[in-house]
Regions:
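Short boundary/linker motifs that mark transitions into or out of structured domains
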Residues: 8, 15, 185, 190-255, ...
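Positively charged, aromatic-enriched patches within helix-turn-helix-type DNA-binding elements
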Residues: 257-291
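Residue register of alpha-helical TPR repeats
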Residues: 2, 31, 38, 70, ...
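"A position-specific structural signal for the A-helix of alpha-solenoid helical repeats
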Residues: 6, 35, 67, 74, ...
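Short, amphipathic alpha-helical interaction segments positioned at domain boundaries
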Residues: 325-335, 395-411
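Amphipathic alpha-helical segments of tetratricopeptide repeats
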Residues: 21, 28, 54-60, 93-104, ...
Length: 411
């Protein structure tokens, strides 16, 4: 490695992409192309970074397996930043094995962390937990230790384990300060701020609505009350044996019924009101009433033993088991597309296919939702056809952790 390449690599490790480019900007050899690609990625020029890294990977000879593996890791990180989540992780796994075989522990761990972050974006929390658990960040460069701790913090936040998230963020902050990389320090500060922003609106009979932070939501979900969670679309009841969770995200009609009944608790909701709210019909007939009875029966079966549904003279009322209190958690974002807006709130440009993958929905469904949001000026599109990406303004003032896909209940 010549002195300019070494100096450029040190600049990149310190978070100084401009300093790195000054040393190798005019060079076309594969090591310089790789460093230029990484520098462009740090500057946010991901398309150019992808091009340079591709040229570098093709330029290394077949015998330079370590250099090619490092290029693959950099390409995977650029793909993650561009929210290209549909590719197979097989190449990244191969790169990890090559790096470990050649004793490059730091880059191997970096590659594994890229895989963890991809799983977190896709909402695959169990898989992310399994991938993160065996990783040992001791003895690593501070910047990499900070990334590892940030991944632990994000997983803990998505699991609603705020104490573990705070501890991981403390480790991330210490490592980021030691690394002296401003971008890492800003990322830690933003993650810590999410803990202190409102995360949901709490509605309960006899009390005024109030905003809850994540720690307060965690405490509420651990208390002996029935929680109708409109953020994650389900019902939860904590007990000595553990939390009972009834997911209704894939049953929109049943969830709409549960939500309407919870909003009226301890009172009831008349049949015409339920039909208008759930079936969007202002002129109910016998067909609507029959369908309402069927859906109420389905909901009654799903909610046992958390709650029952009593028929009243004018409609239906939700009755939590054992006379428990009921709380309705409402999301901070108004509208049916809260999870979609929560994904876009990270400021990255997402493709329709990546959004569909993260939401576990069809591309057609996501396209319809994006069209509705675009008509309301809540999202905007850049590019055309396969290059089209979607952006949304940041959602200042509250956190969207509870709205992200697969944000699981407390175990």
């Amino acid at each position: 490695m010549d002195s300019l390449i070494a100096a450029s690599a040190r600049a990149l490790a310190a978070g100084d992409p401009l300093g790195a480019l000054k040393r190798v900007a005019l060079r076309e050899d594969p090591p310089a192309l790789a460093l230029r690609g990484i520098a462009m990625a740090q500057l946010g020029e991901h398309l150019r970074a992808r091009e340079l890294l591709g040229r570098a990977a093709r330029g290394f000879g077949s015998h330079e397996v370590l250099a090619r593996a490092r290029c693959r890791v950099a390409q995977a990180e650029v793909a993650l930043a561009m929210r290209e989540l549909g590719g197979s992780p097989h190449l990244l796994t191969q790169a990890v094995l090559t790096l470990e075989a050649h004793g490059d522990r730091a880059n191997a761990l970096h590659a594994r962390l890229i895989g963890v972050r991809r799983l977190l974006l896709l909402g695959r929390l169990d898989a992310a937990d399994q991938a993160l658990a065996p990783l040992d960040a001791r003895g690593l460069p501070p910047a990499l230790a900070a990334v590892a701790a940030l991944s632990e913090a994000e997983l803990a936040l998505r699991r609603l384990r705020t104490g573990a998230a705070e501890a991981a963020l403390d480790r991330a902050q210490a490592a980021a300060e030691q690394a002296r990389v401003p971008a890492l320090q800003a990322e830690v500060a933003e993650a810590r701020a999410a803990l202190h922003r409102p995360a949901a609106r709490c509605l309960s009979a006899g009390t005024a609505p109030r905003m809850l932070r994540l720690a307060e939501v965690e405490a509420l979900l651990s208390s002996p009350v029935l929680v109708v969670d409109a953020c994650r679309r389900g019902l939860q009841l904590a007990s000595a044996e553990g939390a009972l969770w009834r997911p209704l995200a894939r049953r929109p009609v049943l969830f709409a019924l549960a939500r309407a009944l919870a909003a009226a608790w301890p009172g009831d909701v008349d049949r015409e009101g339920l039909i208008e709210t759930v079936f969007r019909s202002r002129d109910p007939d016998d067909t609507h009433r029959a369908r309402l009875r069927v859906e109420i029966g389905r909901l009654r079966g799903l909610l046992a033993p958390l709650a029952g549904i009593d028929a009243t003279a004018r409609g239906y009322a939700l009755k939590p088991s054992d006379g428990r209190a009921l709380v309705l958690l409402e999301p901070p974002i108004v509208g049916e597309q809260a999870a979609l807006l929560a994904l876009l709130a990270d400021g990255a440009a997402w493709s329709t296919s990546a959004l569909a993958l993260a939401l576990d929905a069809s591309q057609r469904t996501v396209q319809r939702a994006l069209a509705e949001l675009q008509a309301q000026s809540r999202v905007r599109a850049i590019g055309r056809a396969r290059a089209q990406r979607w952006l949304a303004p940041s959602l200042a003032g509250f956190t969207t952790i509870l709205l992200l896909p697969a944000a699981l209940p407390i175990a």
